[in-house]
Amino acid sequence: GGFLLASGGYDRFASVPNKIANTYIVYAMTQAGMGKEIQKEYDAALKIALQSKDGYQLAMMAIAADHMKDKESFQKIMTELDRSYLLSGLVSETSVVNSRGASLRVESHALYALALMLQPEPNILRINELLATILKEKAYYGYGSTQATVLALKAVVSFSKLVGQMAEDANVQFTLNHTPVLDLKTSADHLKEGTNHLVVNYLKPDAMVPYDFDVQYSTHQP
């Protein structure tokens, strides 16, 4: 149920635990479109990931399960990922490039975010939270390791596409001081002195998308 891995070599891959290397290979092969050809390896990696409760392994196998059209396992893994994230912030041992610290956090969180985006009703708030955590790890040279940077960018781009599609499907009404805001822009005519009230109403509660409210003003009173 696993792959025959070379034990020699001087790079970081040689020191990666076999269970993680096998999980990554299954993940990569399902990404490439393979399915029944690696069923035994997939089943073995799935069992090990669920037993490990490791965030990195679980997130990869969630994505693999989706590609394998294994809905039952996908949901089971996502439940475990959600529990792990809420309890411990998604603890992981290491990654396929033997990452630690910030790089490992970015890789694990990016994979978890990508897995969340595969759900029929993605948890947008959770994904936003994960991406915010990832962006905080960004340095001048990227998000840590090359693998971490690639996964971080993939998560950000995928989320942009997801939100864009949801925004097209969402029916949102903005009301400022009981006046509908039709063009999503307001002027002084819509505002009054003192307290102003902005109401955002989603006509489809299952199609909620994030929004930004930008206020610009000048005043003679400091």
Indicate where each model-derived feature is located.
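Extracellular LysM carbohydrate-binding repeats and other cell-envelope/extracellular binding modules
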Residues: 1
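Long, domain-scale non-catalytic interaction/scaffolding regions in large secretory-pathway
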Residues: 5-15, 20-222
